[in-house]
């Protein structure tokens, strides 16, 4: 029996009334763009795409050549199809409406074109993260404000991980599914349907080098994880950290765990490291659709009403019971302080 292609999967979702034709075509365009990015990434040094681009993004971070290339691939692929009203990228200061020469559709697309790009020169898995919102009604030329919707309003989200194989992980609000790129056929095929994150776990992913900057509930929570079976938790935990959110979250979707990037006082002006609109919201939806949870430590990520396009938040996501435990530490600390 032949495997289900992404095209067939999306058509079936349309026939079931879960997506419309425009959303189906938009996701297909994003998938094709990800295929192009996968080819560029896989060329590495042979394609002359490694190293810094000599420019910075709105966050003040140095851009890699592949950041710029991936951003341009996604913008160009989505400009002319008639499905989008505007795009927003982690690599751009402001959103970009579809040019006037092309028809505009009903959707807004947000993306991190190459998450984890600081690892690209050492051949670690990187990926593209994307989120789809509906454009507010009666907005002819959407600007940044049109994108400021809570994550619960997302109608689709996904990421494409460029590793030993290229995989597209997607939700349209009815489960989380993984598709693997068949390079010979040039199409994604369904390889894991309805991914499920185990409710309990003994693995956590965090950058321990920032420990001295954490607030008290984080110090207590991770301290108890490290204490193992002799400590308050009564079981041993393993730590994993790839420093590529796509790779860390993909592992959690595959076998469970909790991914943590907490608030820290290293730069108190920033509420967190990760971007709400480009990283936390799409990953939060994917994880929740796979039976997991996604919180800031104090509130559900998908409930946050954003106030700016490049807003940052702390992130705790993964196995439901472990996320709840981390939240409990934060709430207990806050309650004790009154």
UniProtKB/Swiss-Prot annotation:
Cofactor(s) the protein requires to work: Mg(2+)
CC annotations in GO: cytosol
UniProt-recorded Gene Ontology molecular function terms: fructose 1,6-bisphosphate 1-phosphatase activity; magnesium ion binding
Record EC number: 3.1.3.11
Residues the entry annotates as binding Mg(2+) 1: 90, 112, 114
GO BP field: fructose 1,6-bisphosphate metabolic process; fructose 6-phosphate metabolic process; fructose metabolic process; gluconeogenesis; sucrose biosynthetic process
Keywords: Carbohydrate metabolism, Cytoplasm, Hydrolase, Magnesium, Metal-binding
Places the protein is found: Cytoplasm
One Pfam family named in its UniProt record: FBPase
Sites where the protein binds Mg(2+) 2: 112, 115, 279
The organism's place on the tree of life at top rank: Bacteria
Residues that coordinate or bind substrate: 115-118, 207, 273
Pathway(s) where this gene product acts: Carbohydrate biosynthesis; gluconeogenesis
Coiled-coil annotated spans: none
Catalytic activity: beta-D-fructose 1,6-bisphosphate + H2O = beta-D-fructose 6-phosphate + phosphate
Keyword Cytoplasm: yes
Listed InterPro entries: FBPase_C_dom, FBPase_class-1, FBPase_N, FBPtase
Free-text cofactor note: Binds 2 magnesium ions per subunit.
UniProt cross-references to PANTHER family, sorted A to Z: FRUCTOSE-1,6-BISPHOSPHATASE-RELATED (PTHR11556), SEDOHEPTULOSE-1,7-BISPHOSPHATASE, CHLOROPLASTIC (PTHR11556:SF35)
Complexes and interactors: Homotetramer.
Family according to the record: Belongs to the FBPase class 1 family.
The protein's name: Fructose-1,6-bisphosphatase class 1
Provenance organism: Stenotrophomonas maltophilia (strain R551-3)
């Amino acid at each position: 029996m032949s495997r289900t292609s992404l095209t067939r999967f999306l058509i079936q979702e349309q026939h079931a009334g879960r997506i419309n034709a425009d959303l189906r075509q938009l996701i297909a365009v994003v998938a094709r763009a990800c295929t192009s990015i996968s080819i560029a990434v896989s060329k590495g040094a042979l394609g002359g795409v490694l190293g810094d681009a000599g420019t910075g993004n709105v966050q003040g971070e140095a851009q890699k050549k592949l950041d710029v290339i991936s951003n341009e691939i996604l913008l160009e692929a989505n400009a002319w199809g008639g499905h989008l009203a505007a795009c927003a990228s982690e690599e751009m200061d402001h959103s970009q409406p579809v040019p006037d020469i092309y028809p505009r559709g009903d959707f807004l697309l947000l993306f991190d074109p190459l998450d984890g790009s600081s690892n690209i020169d050492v051949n670690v898995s990187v990926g593209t993260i994307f989120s789809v919102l509906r454009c507010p009604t009666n907005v002819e030329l959407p600007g940044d404000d049109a994108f400021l919707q809570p994550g619960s309003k997302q109608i689709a989200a996904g990421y494409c991980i460029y590793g030993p194989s290229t995989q597209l992980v997607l939700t349209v609000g009815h489960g989380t599914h993984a598709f693997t790129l068949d390079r010979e056929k040039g199409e994604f095929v369904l390889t894991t349907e309805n991914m499920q994150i185990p409710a309990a776990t003994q693995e956590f992913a965090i950058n321990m080098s920032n420990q001295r900057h954490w607030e008290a509930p984080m110090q207590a929570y991770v301290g108890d994880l490290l204490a193992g079976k002799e400590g308050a938790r009564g079981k041993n935990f393993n730590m994993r950290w790839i420093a590529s959110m796509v790779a860390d979250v993909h592992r959690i979707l595959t076998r469970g765990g909790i991914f943590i990037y907490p608030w820290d006082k290293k730069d108190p002006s920033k509420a967190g490291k990760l971007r709400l609109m480009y990283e936390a919201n799409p990953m939060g939806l994917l994880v929740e659709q796979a039976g997991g949870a996604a919180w800031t430590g104090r509130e559900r990520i998908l409930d946050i009403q954003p106030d700016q396009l490049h807003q940052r938040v702390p992130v705790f996501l993964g196995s439901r019971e472990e996320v709840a435990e981390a939240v409990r530490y934060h709430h207990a600390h806050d309650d004790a302080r009154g």
